[in-house]
Amino acid sequence: MNSFKLNTYVIGGPENIQERHLLPYETKSAALVRFVSLFSSLGLDVFQLRFKNSSDTDFIKLANEIVQVLKNTSCKLCIN
């Protein structure tokens, strides 16, 4: 059995992004992707996506955007 060395784990979704963290004209989903990209480039081990109160289409779109920014990192994506 493989064991993982996971030291950093972040759970979040667009609903966790506060207005003060948004760039001008940025959506909460875009800000989340930006944060995940930054954190994963700095060594984040796991990001757990929680996406409440939204359509399946929006969820899939956001998950795909996050997968794209995680491609060249060692960060794992967990979906809840």
In which residue ranges do the predicted regions lie?
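Conserved N-terminal beta1-alpha1 strand-loop-helix module at the mouth
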Residues: 1-80
